Structures are given as structure tokens and as C-alpha cells.
Amino acid sequence: ILALAVISLVGLGLFVMRELQAERPAVNLRLLRNVTFASGTVLGGVLGLGLFAGLFLMPMFLQKLLGYTAVDSGLAIMPRSVAMALTMPVAGRIYNRVGPKRLVGFGFFITALSFWQLSRLSVAIGYWDIFFPQTLQGVGFGMVFVALSTASLSTISKPDMTAATGLYNFFRQITGSVGIAMAASQLTRGGNHYRALLVEGISDYRDKTHAWTQTLSGVLNQQGIEPSMVHQKTLGLLDKVVTQQATMLSFNHVHFLIACIFFAVIPFVFLLRTRVISLETQSGKAAKGEELPWKT
């Protein structure tokens, strides 16, 4: 893994050097000298990370820990998509009125808040414990999508628009893939880590452990389990509970990490500087060759 990481970093460095020196680069990295576009690209990358990582985590959480079927988990995460679809047209309508900074900043804040809420779940939750964070997340994504892409590309000249659009979408797709990989890796590592911590706290000499195993053994005896198998089944059920709780904690950990990332990039919103103008005025000024006004 280390060797592949070194090869990847060297290859990335050579690629960046080549693209910066080429007269007609395949990926025009010079566009990142534009502060508004660069900050918008960073925010768009984090947006892609949260979007894809969240879409990866929630179905796994519902099916693996809560026993949802694929259909039920799809219905459970539907509020996010519905909220996003309803919010995007509204965000487009109020974009010129409130400006991109407020829309994007508030959208990132409530999205981070939704991931923080998801980091506080347990295996004893119900549907509504999922519904409200998912809906809030959809509203946040819906507010950011339209406003961020418009603001990021508004300072790009027309000849560079195609390259800038491709670069913006490229970063968002790449970080989306990174988000899924990061989430999967952290789930595995977190599960092992939290399981080790939980196992350290289990001992026959602890009153809670002893009481739990005695209660469970009594239940198994009442169910007609052979006495010789009771102890083995008790340990098996205890192991299952520990694994379940460790997995739950690892999901919470990943959601918390994503929330921290969203909170951390909010200052980039203040670097957005964009032209905000009605379509009618924009068409008239463009026809006359006049400069479009700036709104920061």
C-alpha cells in the first residue's frame, strides 16, 4: 500500500507539472488561480464527498444494524432526495436576492448539523430519528448545489467556461469516490478499534457483565436449551452484541468526521465573489458590451 501511495503521489505531481506547462492542457489547472473558482471547487469537492459518502453509509447502517430490507432502507432515505428536489428550485429563485454566500454558507452549516445528528444515533432508534436528519441534509444539499456551481463559474471567462465546468465536476466526482473509500475504510478500522475497547470492559469479575450473562443464561434455560450449550450460546450472543455496538460506534464516528469536514470548509464561503444580476439585465448589458456588476 505504501509503495502504491508513493507511486500515486509521484504520478500526481508529474501530472500537475505537465498540465501547468502545456499550452493546451487536458485539464486546465491554471483556472485554480481564480480565488472564487478555487474556493468553489474545494467546496464542491466536499459537497461531493458528503453526498456520496452519506448515500453509501445510510443504507448500510439501516440494513446491517437495524435489519431493514433494501426496499425499506430506500424508503427511509427518500426524504433526503425529496427535500433536495423541493429546495433546489427555491434556492435558484432566491439566489439573486440573498447572494451565494448566505445560501452556500447556511447550506453547509445545516448539512454539517445533519451529519452531527447522525453521529449520535443508537441501535434503539426509530424511523423518525432518521427522517429529520435526512430531510435536513436534503435541504442543505439543495441550497448548495445551484448556488455553489453558479457562483464558482460566474467569474470564469466565456472561452474557459467549458474547461472550468469540466474541472469543477471532475473534482466533485473524484472527492465523491474518495468519500466512499474513506467511509468504508473508517468503518472497518473503527469497528475493530471500538470492538477492542468494548472487549476490554467485559469480564466475569465485573458485576454488570456477570448479571447480564446470568440473566441471559436464565432466559436460555427457560427456552429449553441444553444446559451444556447454555454457556456457549451466552458467549455467542454477547459477542454479537459487542460487534453490533462496535459497528454502531464506527458509523457514528464516520458521520462525525464528515460533519467536522463540512464545518471546517465553511470559511471558504467568504472567498466567493460573484456577479449577481437578473437575466434581463444580463442580456441587455452583454449586448451592449457593458461590464456586469459584482456582488460579494
Pin down the residues of each PLM region:
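Transmembrane core module of solute transporters
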Residues: I1-A163, L271, R275-T296
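Cytoplasmic loop-to-transmembrane helix junctions
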Residues: D160-L167, S250
